[in-house]
A protein has these predicted regions:
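Short, glycine/acidic-enriched capping/hinge loops at junctions between secondary-structure elements
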Residues: 6-7, 29-31
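Auxiliary tRNA-acceptor-end handling modules of aminoacyl-tRNA synthetases
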Residues: 30-51, 63, 67, 72-82, ...
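Short amphipathic, charge-patterned alpha-helical segments
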Residues: 1-11
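Catalytic tyrosine of NAD(P)H-dependent dehydrogenase/reductases that use a Tyr as the general acid/base
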Residues: 54
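Short acidic beta-strand-loop surface patches of small beta-rich interaction domains
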Residues: 16-30
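A short, compositionally biased
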Residues: 11-17, 83
Length: 218
């Protein structure tokens, strides 16, 4: 559906990221096999905005591992929503400071400019466990060790793979709007909302609410 979306894009004010095919939501990477009714979804809609955020999260995780290196990271986590973004932490040898955060953000923009394909494949749960063990993603390794389903969907950018539940954008070129801010013991990746999908809102965290969320997720 990617080519068809490209042909219709100029009719839409925001980026098309998903498509309803005969009423069923699909990713743009799927192939059209027969005549059907299509309805495109943009980043200006809630489900489209969530898909965009999922893509930025994946881009961020890859940028962190690219910048710091797998062997120096004990754990990289996206915790919960803060303001208009997600609070994240990196556990490992490297000290998180403004210089490192700027390098991570620069790597994200670099990959967005490269418009790398985001591919999906279905793997056996055992393979997913081994993959996350190799990457040092201990929380995801534990998650899949006790999952009862036999297969899971894994997304990849080049050779880097990760698991996300939900729909994904077809390539990194869609992921143009984000900003990283140092915050508390980690940082926040700030992203647009559906109402203004090309505008990154200013970072205005509610500190009391943040500390309540932080305590509740320990």
């Amino acid at each position: 559906y990617l080519q068809i979306a490209g042909e219709y894009q100029e009719r839409y004010p925001h980026d098309i990221v998903l498509v309803y095919v005969n009423g069923k939501l699909q990713e743009l990477g799927k192939k059209l096999k027969k005549d059907c009714a299509l309805h495109f979804v943009t980043t200006g809609e809630t489900i489209g905005n969530l898909t965009y955020r999922r893509g930025v999260s994946f881009l961020l995780v890859k940028a962190v591992y690219d910048t710091i290196g797998h062997d120096k990271i004990e754990q990289m986590r996206i915790h919960f929503s803060v303001d208009k973004g997600y609070y994240c932490t990196i556990k490992g040898e490297q000290k998180l400071d403004q210089e490192l955060l700027a390098r991570i953000e620069e790597r994200m923009h670099e990959m967005a400019d490269m418009d790398l394909s985001i591919r999906k494949r279905s793997v056996h749960t055992d393979e997913a466990v081994e993959m996350f063990r190799k990457y040092g993603m201990k929380d995801k390794e534990r998650l899949f060790r006790y999952r009862r389903v036999s297969t899971v969907n894994i997304y990849s950018i080049n050779e880097f793979e990760d698991y996300y539940y939900g729909y994904m954008v077809p390539s990194t070129g869609y992921l143009k709007y984000f900003k990283l801010y140092l915050y508390d013991e980690g940082f926040v990746v700030q992203m647009p909302e559906a109402a203004e999908p090309e505008k990154i809102p200013p970072f205005q965290p509610q500190n009391k609410l943040f500390h309540v969320l932080k305590e509740s997720t320990r």
